[in-house]
């Protein structure tokens, strides 16, 4: 097609050139130019016919190729559609299997949770009973400790009272002993003082008698 357009363009350019230069040539040259133009027109017509034939052949080949390509495309599309259907079926089967697996896993999880809850409840009850027993034992130990402390306090109080009584008795005995000793000491001192006084009086009388006798002596 491009070749035919180029050939027609050449013919038009040649005809234009001939038309421009026609007034400047002699009749013989004009006749030769006309003959050449006629021949060129025939050649251009032949070229156009050949180009049309080539274009028709190319169009036929292109149409056949397009038909083959379309058939191949349809086959490809059909194959892709079949593959898509197969993939969709596989996906549906996989989804079904996944749903079944999920349901089974959920059921297993529920059963496991129930078992764990039961275990937790049993452990909680055991822990509560153990805690209650421990609390009762602690309360009993506290009561025992309190009773022992009260008994120890009573013993200490009794011992303190006995010690206080013993101290009071000892103080009373010591006071009585001291009073007796003081009375004895006082009596002893009084007797000694009386004896000393008598001795002193006797000595004084003797001295007086001696003095009188000395004074009476010649």
Curated annotation (Swiss-Prot):
**Compartments, as annotated in UniProt:** Secreted
Q: Which Gene3D superfamilies match?
A: 6.10.140.1860
What InterPro entries does the record tag this protein with? AFP_Alpha-Hairpin_sf, Antifreeze_1
> What cellular component GO annotations does this protein have?
extracellular region
Top-level taxonomic group: Eukaryota
Q: Which GO terms describe its molecular function?
A: antifreeze activity; identical protein binding
Question: What UniProt keywords are attached to this protein's entry?
Answer: Antifreeze protein, Repeat, Secreted, Signal
Q: How does activity depend on temperature?
A: Thermolabile, displays irreversible loss of activity and aggregation at room temperature.
Tissue-wise expression:
Detected in blood serum (at protein level). Detected in liver.
Answer whether the UniProt record assigns the keyword Signal to this protein.
Answer: yes
Point out the signal peptide segment. Answer: 1-23
**Misc. comment:** The concentration in blood serum is about 0.2 mg/ml.
Q: What does this protein do?
A: Contributes to protect fish blood from freezing at subzero sea water temperatures. Lowers the blood freezing point by about 1.1 degrees at a concentration of 0.1 mg/ml, and by about 1.5 degrees at a concentration of 0.2 mg/ml. Binds to nascent ice crystals and prevents further growth.
The UniProt subunit note reads as follows:
Homodimer.
Show the domain comment: The polypeptide has an alpha-hairpin structure. Two subunits dimerize to form a four-helix, rod-like structure. Each subunit is composed of a cap structure and of tandem 11 residue repeats with the sequence [TI]-X-X-X-A-X-X-X-A-X-X. Each repeat forms three helical turns with an average of 3.7 residues per turn, as opposed to 3.6 residues per turn for a classical alpha helix.
Q: Which family does it belong to?
A: Belongs to the type-I AFP family.
The entry's protein name is Antifreeze protein Maxi
In which organism is this protein found?
Answer: Pseudopleuronectes americanus (Winter flounder)
């Amino acid at each position: 097609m491009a070749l035919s357009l180029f050939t027609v363009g050449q013919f038009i350019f040649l005809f234009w050139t001939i038309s421009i230069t026609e007034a400047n040539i002699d009749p013989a040259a004009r006749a030769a130019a006309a003959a050449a133009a006629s021949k060129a027109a025939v050649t251009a017509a032949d070229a156009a016919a050949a180009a049309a034939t080539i274009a028709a052949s190319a169009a036929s080949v292109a149409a056949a190729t397009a038909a083959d390509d379309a058939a191949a495309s349809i086959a490809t599309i059909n194959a892709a559609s079949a593959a898509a259907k197969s993939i969709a079926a596989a996906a549906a089967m996989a989804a079904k299997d996944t749903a079944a697996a999920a349901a089974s896993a959920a059921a297993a999880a529920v059963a496991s949770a129930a078992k764990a809850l039961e275990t937790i409840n049993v452990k909680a009850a055991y822990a509560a009973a153990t805690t209650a027993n421990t609390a009762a034992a602690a309360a009993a130990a506290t009561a025992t400790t309190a009773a022992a402390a009260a008994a120890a306090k009573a013993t200490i109080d009794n011992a303190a009272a006995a010690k206080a009584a013993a101290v009071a008795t000892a103080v009373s005995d010591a006071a009585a002993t001291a009073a007796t000793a003081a009375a004895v000491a006082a009596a002893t001192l009084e007797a000694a003082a009386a004896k000393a006084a008598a001795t002193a009086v006797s000595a004084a009388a003797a001295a007086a008698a001696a003095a009188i006798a000395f004074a009476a002596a010649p």
